[in-house]
Amino acid sequence: MTRYMLDTNTVSHLIKKHPAVARRVVATPMAFLCISAITNGELFFGLAKRPDAKQLHLAVRELLLRVDVLPWGGAIAEHYGTVRAGMERQGKILAPLDLLIATHALSVGAVLVTNDRAFGRVAGLLLEDWTD
């Protein structure tokens, strides 16, 4: 079965109980869901900005207990350099953290689950939008 890497915006939709996203997550075995260590960092950044949001903290920590957080480094870093250089040559840009997440998904052969169309600029990246 396909591995699905949830982008930060998809995790946010899940935590906010977006019906379509929740349905897809429930229908997908947890072994096939993952997030990037970059998304993990973004989640903790969001929590640091809202230290009093107890329900949010609980929801994020519960998710992190259930989903694989894939480490970022080594071969992924090399792939990032190649992809970024190629995109710059073509005049394509993507937010820095988004490009780190995109190359992570590419490197591990995962479909990136996001509703951010900007990820479509990354050649070869498989995308799905679960907010539909």
Region annotations inferred by a language model:
Residues 7, 36-39, 115, 123:
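A secondary-structure boundary/capping signal
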Residues 67-113:
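Active-site neighborhoods of divalent-metal-dependent phosphate/nucleic-acid chemistry enzymes
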Residues 1-2, 102, 106-132:
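Acidic, PIN/NYN-like endoribonuclease modules and their adjacent C-terminal/linker elements
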Residues 11-12, 22, 41-44, 70, ...:
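Nucleotide phosphate-binding site architecture
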Residues 7-8, 21, 43, 80, ...:
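Generic structural signal for small/hydrophobic residues in well-ordered secondary structure
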Residues 10-11, 39, 76, 101, ...:
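Alpha-helix capping/helix-boundary segments
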Residues 1-35, 45-64, 132:
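Short, well-structured N-terminal submotif of metal-dependent ribonuclease cores
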